[in-house]
Amino acid sequence: MRFNEVLKDVSTYEAGKPIELVVREYGIDSKDVIKLASNENPYGTSPKVIAKIQELAKNMCLYPDDSMYELKDALAKKYNLESSNIIIGSGSDQILEFCIHAKCKKDSKILMAKTTFAMYEIYGKHVGAEIIKTNSEQHNLEEFSELYKKHGADIIFLCIPNNPLGECLDKNDVYEFLKTIDKNTLVVVDGAYQEYAAFKDEKKRICPKDLIDTFPNAIYLGTFSKAYSLGGMRVGYGFAQNEIIQNLYKIRAPFNITTLSLAAAIEALKDEEFVNDCISKNFEEMKRYEEYVTKKGFEYIPSYTNFITIKFGDKYVSKEVAQKLLERGMIVRDLTSYKQNAIRVTIGKPEQNTKLFQLLDEVLQNL
Amino acid sequence: MRFNEVLKDVSTYEAGKPIELVVREYGIDSKDVIKLASNENPYGTSPKVIAKIQELAKNMCLYPDDSMYELKDALAKKYNLESSNIIIGSGSDQILEFCIHAKCKKDSKILMAKTTFAMYEIYGKHVGAEIIKTNSEQHNLEEFSELYKKHGADIIFLCIPNNPLGECLDKNDVYEFLKTIDKNTLVVVDGAYQEYAAFKDEKKRICPKDLIDTFPNAIYLGTFSKAYSLGGMRVGYGFAQNEIIQNLYKIRAPFNITTLSLAAAIEALKDEEFVNDCISKNFEEMKRYEEYVTKKGFEYIPSYTNFITIKFGDKYVSKEVAQKLLERGMIVRDLTSYKQNAIRVTIGKPEQNTKLFQLLDEVLQNL
């Protein structure tokens, strides 16, 4: 059967390995498997959110309120926006997919950093767009500017802070860059890990309302998957001027998040104390990683997220390290598919991190 | 800002009104609102599934197993297929979206019945495809054949049984039609309500394995939203030859269903007794609708689903009837947007149906 030609050039996203797979393939008991691979919140979901979902589980037969009135209202209040500035997605992933489908077609141009969230490129290829990347691994706005002057772009992706590397642009630099961008270019500011970055360094904080008021061609994306501990529930949001939101809405399918996801997100917004507590612990534990990696003589990228990227240089092969850890029930993310000889490790709970250090010692001794 | 031109012609799907909206707009207590508008299973979700989700609610922070190994394995066993014949979607809606994006681009042709599931056309317009519809409201395969000979088609949609009208093609007629279709045309057999149709009349039963073995250009879509009582959890599936599945997989985003949706679907498949019991009650109650409508002198379309379409002819205006019912806390689906002077009513529980008859009597007397 014939399919669209653009699909020939499309690869599928390599998701982090689930605990179930390690159980199946290596026969390790699920309670002995530690997953530090998908930047899930290791402290679990807020007990208040869990209780709410247990109470509402009986509503699984009912479609969600597709207007998402209550969630949009809560987000609008928190971020000082109008509901008409908001669209909800099945993870913020889905909203970046909407952006690409709304703006791009074959031979449209999409500008991004060399090593950034893989879905930008994958979604771009779905519509046959041309992907333009900087030479630098990390976000380098001078290179972005040069490439933009040379090629133009229908969409620019800025991942602030950047997944999978962890670095983060300063807000002021982002603003200076945005001033130079044509109003017909949609700039996607992916803030999936913004809560972490803003906690660590106020200079990194992007205020969504100020961003979209100052730059009407920008859209801010946020998620409940990381700081809000709802990775499994697939809820993200986009904030932009209503003209953009209206066009994205044309692409959104009805009922694009589940009834329980909607309820969980609404409840999670009520428990900011839990969120802040998790973020605080995250950076306490990250110090241990920085010390460990330095002691071992490897390099790491200073991180503004809930993960850290450890580079093995010419000492070890990251793919082998990740595989040996996997066989011991420790799942981390090998970055070979991102052309990095590095692993990305989610900052876990204290005892999980201690275990990671032990297993990494053991694995490296035997490689 | 400029957006893709095809979006100018895109309208958004009008979802059934949620209970929350009636509570907000008419100040009616949520426990007094009855929703017979979205073909949700009125008997709720299986208690076994509810218990499982309450147990697993703590896993909301974890991404799902993106291979969906266990769910695909269970579906493969039930339908005598291989896992490689299966793709899971956020509702079967999402899989029909995948089909359109895999096969169609601007000016591709999509053939469908005049009055059928609205998303076929909406997704088609997202890619700028040409929508070709039969003159007959209900599925008429002779007209499909004539139009196919005249125009060809990249995709043909057959909704068996048909939403929102309720009629259902015979399996043998579908097979005769499929024999005449070119192998490069993808035929989507949307079986969202097949469990109901097959229960009522064996001649309507489509066996997915036999369908895709006989016609390698066909894909069968099923859902957990209707008979399996998980409308709010957004889980559907597509069965096809692996060549088709592989291409749809290129378009699927990772983690396209939630962790709890995956668990709920797996558990729901284990409780077929609940499903059969609900379907049996559905057709018992449908008899009451047929008697009521006949007594009132209206027409209905004999239905192979969990809803019934009631036509008001020149006696009443369906939009007014639906609105007056809404103000009394009874939500039904007005079909004006489908160009029908009719309402579609989900077959509810006995007491809900009794209430609908009472309120409809009251409303019609005052119109």
Curated annotation (Swiss-Prot), chains A, B:
Source superkingdom: Bacteria
Pfam families, per the entry: Aminotran_1_2 (PF00155)
UniProt-recorded Gene Ontology molecular function terms: histidinol-phosphate transaminase activity; pyridoxal phosphate binding
Reaction(s) this enzyme catalyzes, per UniProt: L-histidinol phosphate + 2-oxoglutarate = 3-(imidazol-4-yl)-2-oxopropyl phosphate + L-glutamate
N6-(pyridoxal phosphate)lysine, modified sites: K226
EC annotation from Swiss-Prot or TrEMBL: 2.6.1.9
CDD domains: AAT_like
Record keyword Amino-acid biosynthesis present: yes
GO biological process: L-histidine biosynthetic process
Residues annotated as transmembrane: none
Subunit structure and binding partners: Homodimer.
PANTHER family: HISTIDINOL-PHOSPHATE AMINOTRANSFERASE, HISTIDINOL-PHOSPHATE AMINOTRANSFERASE 2
Family the entry assigns: Belongs to the class-II pyridoxal-phosphate-dependent aminotransferase family. Histidinol-phosphate aminotransferase subfamily.
This protein's name: Histidinol-phosphate aminotransferase
Native source organism of the sequence: Aliarcobacter butzleri (strain RM4018) (Arcobacter butzleri)
